[in-house]
Structures are given as C-alpha cells and as structure tokens.
Amino acid sequence: MGPEAKLYKKLKNKLPQISWIRLENNSLLGTPDLLAYNTSGHFFTVELKVTKGNKVKFSPHQIAFHVKHPNNTFILVEALGPGTVKLFRGSQILELEACGLELEACCLGLEACGLMLDSLGA
C-alpha cells in the first residue's frame, strides 16, 4: 500500500461523518484523489499528498485543475517526518508549490481538518 493510500485509509477511519469516494482516474489527468460529501450535503474534492520534506510536488495537470477549479477543492498534505497533516485550499496550489509546507495552512491536524470540511456549506 502506497503512502497516499495509507493517508486515505487513515482519513476514512478518523472522519467517518464524511462520505469519501476514491477517484482512480487515468483518463482525466489532474483530477483530485477524492470526491467527498459532508453532513450538510456539500460536495468537495481533496487531493492527497504525502511528503518527506518541505516541498510538495504536483503534476502540471494537478496545478491546472486547481487553477481552473479554485472553489470547493482542497489539498491534504501529510509530512512523514513529524506526521503533521495540513489542509490547504485548492486556490493556494501555486503558493503551495512555491513555498512548500512553510505556507500557512487553513487547518492543522486530521481531526481539525475533518471539522472544517464537515462545516462546508453549513
């Protein structure tokens, strides 16, 4: 099981109040990893990233997706060393690529990220 699959499993187990759908899409490059539906009936997407260092790597297709769709899109990054989980808005993708994990996240920690995502559309 790869690191992003492990992060997905952790996310699904710790945040069961959100319906998570894993998108394994090879035909539409750049499509985020997850489609989610919260308790307010709000859909959003989440791109999963796992990194060993400060830098977060994106494909040009992932960048293009988030630039074109800046609303209701998120990037969840787990830093393996400290085990930190940070949530960024999709609209921050260019800054996140440039600054890495030094960029201020909109949420820290898996539980806090879950609360924030579940409150969308409320």
Feature map (PLM): residue ranges:
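Helix N-cap / beta->alpha transition motif
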Residues: 59, 87-95, 109
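Acidic-basic catalytic patches of nuclease active cores, encompassing PD-(D/E)XK
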Residues: 1-25, 39
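Nucleic-acid nuclease catalytic cores
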Residues: 67-92
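Short strand-connecting beta-turns/loops that link adjacent beta-strands
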Residues: 39-41, 80-81
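Conserved catalytic cores of phosphodiester-cleaving nucleases, focusing on short active-site segments
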Residues: 34-36, 42-52
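Beta-rich catalytic cores
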Residues: 30
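Charged phosphate-binding loop/patch that engages nucleotide di/tri-phosphates or the phosphate backbone
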Residues: 97-122
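Mg2+/Mn2+-dependent nuclease catalytic core
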Residues: 51-70
